[in-house]
């Protein structure tokens, strides 16, 4: 879980502010710090993007401005706590950081200490989340700079919503209603978490993107290896991150830290899985990308397996691995003479219990008599199906005592069994007491391995996600994109989420793919055409493919050539935010203003309608000005879907339109995007589909005809 603190102050520029941010990850004990300027303090896009990447469980905000505090709180939503400036003591921040830093040494963090707002954000973090109250953190935290630009693609909340990147609820994490659900073919808990992180943090480094593509390509080609890897290996890997957190706590607190023997066996089995993965991945040597597999996966796995040799010997020596395979986690009797003696006593008692059971079965003629656990009260008893109750009572003496009578079973005991059960409990109690000390020593040694457990978890989850990408590519016919900085070309691009939904619902018509082509020389594309004609789907498809490429996935096209984008901006619809006193039109303008202030030449912008909430002439003027600014001053790739046909006259714009077929005043949407400008928007035809009264439609067409004559 991550906790985040934000400290903000107004800058000398009335429209800007300076922000410091501190994040604490309680699983890795890493405190990340950064500070940055927000050039537009009405939207705070950089802060919003970082919070979406981090996905914190709790946020604390401290500001010297009520207006800024209100805006920050709006971004942080319900997870936010307000910390007063007077509550924090930044003068003590350096001393507090030294108490938490590994070895108490701050010399490695001099650059961070010079960032005033970062340090103040740390003070807010330490105050709100009581970091210094947890002595297990002392001299055990690593400080690092949190990258603001140049490491991950920046995405805002509007983009996550417009592209359906994440599932709306955890219950939909496997459904194809979101990109996460579509790609989530992961087999391990760590893989599912890693996929969520990758979707929040798309890459912007070409070499890292290509590395992921190489591995996906290799696993797609080696289908048999991938299937074994997923079904026989990764599906058995437990949540190593949780176990690592327990082990780290155990080492820091010098206790068992909540570590169970089952956890240690889980790590043991994960190492065995890593050994199997090495063998499977080495079968891909014929692939042209095997060098990448070797460098990124096989060699690191082999190093980790070697690092675990001592751990594996510890577990094999201390634990009864035969019992562990049956789901019973016990200290091996051969490890301790006292445990061996108690185990022998236990076996003798169990043999006597079996002799009593066999005697009753022989006496009653009921072979199905079993020794079972009764729940009320909890104890061991004999069990038969209910129809044998009278047979038991008639064939045995009066010493039989009923323990439990259920709908389908009868549980009973005898004085002899009761004595044996009492003896068994006594021996088991002594066994547990003796094993507790051994368990504590075992955990103490095992806890020192938590750093490499973390590395193993990271590597196995990475393999899991890349294997899921390969499986998704096989299912949905995704192709590897060629990365090119100067153009975006896709042949037969499909919106894979809509396609998946059509297949699931039995929709008869196949998804209509479209070609996408845009480059630096013609970086503005105006898309016109009727509502429901496919304009929105077309521009979302372009953005979705760009995102999929930069997380390392293949894309839904026949062929694809894509650049690496620094960010994606989506302005695709708005609604009134009455609680904030913001109208639909104002919301549109705020979003558009944020885009033109923060977009750069490497941005991808998709706009689906703009300027509808004011007069037609004013809306058109604003749409024209914003489109021209994105085209000329910023120079980014822009897809602009609109009903303002006049925007097609922007010099240098490429015009495309959604096609429709009209026959006998009925409209049929073809969902094909072709070159040129739409003849009209077909609004009255769509109104007819919506069930408008014919008289209203006729009146609308008459008024439209008269207006067009006046304009002419």
Go through each PLM region and give its residues.
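Charged, surface-exposed helical/loop "interaction arms" that form contiguous linear patches used
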Residues: 430-483
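Charged catalytic and DNA/RNA-contacting regions of genome-maintenance
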Residues: 1-218, 236-245, 258-351, 355
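Extended, charged coiled-coil "arm/hinge" scaffolds of SMC/Rad50-like chromosome-maintenance ATPases
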Residues: 401-444, 460
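Secondary-structure edge/capping motif, primarily at the C-terminal ends of alpha-helices
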Residues: 219-223, 244-255, 278-288, 360-363, ...
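ATPase nucleotide-binding head domains, primarily ABC-like/P-loop NTPase cores
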Residues: 115, 387-417, 466-712
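Amphipathic heptad-repeat alpha-helical coiled-coil/stalk segments that mediate oligomerization
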Residues: 94-95, 269-348, 376-414, 464-526, ...
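C-terminal helical "lid" subdomain and adjoining coupling/linker elements of P-loop NTPases
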Residues: 250-269, 694-712
């Amino acid at each position: 879980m991550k906790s985040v603190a934000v400290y903000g102050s107004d800058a000398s520029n009335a429209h800007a502010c300076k922000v410091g941010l501190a994040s604490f990850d309680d699983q890795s004990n890493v405190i990340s710090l950064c500070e940055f300027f927000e050039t537009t303090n009405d939207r705070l896009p950089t802060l919003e993007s970082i919070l979406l990447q981090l996905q914190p469980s709790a946020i604390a905000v401290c500001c010297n401005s009520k207006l800024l505090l209100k805006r920050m709180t709006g971004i942080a939503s319900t997870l936010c706590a307000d910390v007063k400036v007077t509550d924090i003591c930044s003068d003590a921040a350096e001393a507090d950081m030294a108490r938490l830093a590994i070895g108490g040494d701050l010399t490695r963090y001099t650059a961070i200490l010079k960032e005033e707002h970062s340090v103040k954000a740390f003070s807010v973090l330490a105050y709100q989340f009581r970091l210094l109250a947890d002595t297990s953190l002392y001299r055990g935290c690593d400080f690092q700079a949190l990258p603001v630009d140049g490491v991950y693609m920046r995405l805002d909340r509007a983009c996550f919503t417009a592209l359906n990147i994440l599932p709306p609820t955890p219950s939909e994490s496997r459904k194809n209603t979101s990109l996460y659900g579509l790609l989530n073919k992961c087999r391990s808990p760590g893989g599912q978490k890693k996929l969520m992180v990758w979707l929040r943090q798309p890459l912007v480094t070409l070499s890292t993107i290509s590395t992921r593509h190489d591995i996906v390509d290799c696993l797609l080609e080696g289908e048999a290896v991938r299937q074994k890897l997923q079904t026989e290996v990764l599906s058995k890997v437990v949540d190593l991150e949780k176990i690592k957190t327990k082990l780290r706590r155990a080492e820091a607190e010098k206790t068992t830290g909540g570590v169970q023997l089952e956890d240690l066996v889980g790590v043991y089995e994960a190492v065995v899985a890593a050994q199997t993965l090495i063998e499977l991945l080495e079968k891909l040597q014929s692939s042209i990308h095997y060098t990448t597999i070797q460098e990124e996966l096989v060699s690191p796995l082999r190093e980790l397996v070697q690092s675990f040799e001592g751990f594996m010997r510890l577990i094999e020596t201390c634990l009864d691995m035969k019992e562990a395979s049956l789901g019973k986690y016990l200290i091996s009797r051969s490890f301790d003479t006292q445990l061996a003696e108690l185990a022998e006593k236990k076996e003798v008692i169990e043999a006597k219990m079996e002799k009593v059971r066999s005697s009753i079965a022989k006496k009653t003629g009921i072979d199905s008599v079993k020794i079972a656990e009764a729940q009320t009260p909890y104890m061991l008893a004999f069990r038969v199906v209910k129809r044998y109750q009278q047979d038991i009572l008639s064939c045995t003496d009066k010493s039989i005592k009923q323990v439990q009578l259920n709908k389908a079973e009868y549980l009973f005991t005898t004085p002899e069994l009761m004595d044996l059960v009492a003896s068994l409990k006594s021996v088991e109690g002594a066994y547990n007491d003796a094993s507790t000390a051994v368990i504590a020593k075992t955990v103490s040694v095992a806890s020192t391995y938590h750093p490499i457990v973390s590395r193993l978890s990271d590597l196995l989850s990475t393999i899991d996600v890349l294997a899921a990408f390969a499986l998704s590519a096989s299912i949905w016919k995704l192709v590897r994109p060629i990365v090119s900085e100067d153009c975006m070309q896709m042949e037969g691009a499909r919106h894979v989420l809509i396609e998946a939904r059509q297949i699931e619902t039995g929709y008869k018509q196949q998804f209509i793919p479209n070609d996408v082509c845009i480059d630096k020389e013609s970086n503005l594309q105006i898309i016109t055409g009727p509502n429901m004609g496919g304009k929105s789907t077309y521009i979302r498809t372009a953005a979705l493919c760009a995102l999929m490429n930069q997380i390392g996935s293949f894309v839904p096209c026949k062929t694809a050539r894509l650049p690496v984008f620094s960010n994606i901006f989506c302005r695709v619809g708005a609604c009134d935010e009455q609680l904030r006193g913001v109208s639909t039109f104002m919301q549109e303008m705020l979003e558009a203003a944020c885009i033109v202030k923060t977009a750069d030449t490497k941005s991808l912008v998709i706009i689906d309608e703009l300027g509808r909430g004011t007069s037609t002439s004013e809306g058109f003027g604003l749409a024209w000005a914003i489109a021209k600014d994105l085209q000329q001053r910023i120079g980014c790739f822009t897809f602009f879907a609109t009903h303002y046909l006049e925007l097609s006259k922007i010099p240098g714009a490429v015009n495309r339109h959604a096609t429709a077929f009209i026959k006998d005043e009925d409209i049929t949407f073809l969902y094909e995007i072709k070159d040129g400008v739409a003849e009209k928007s077909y609004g009255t035809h769509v109104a007819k589909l919506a069930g408008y009264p014919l008289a209203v439609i006729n009146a609308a067409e008459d008024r439209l005809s008269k207006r067009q004559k006046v304009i002419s």
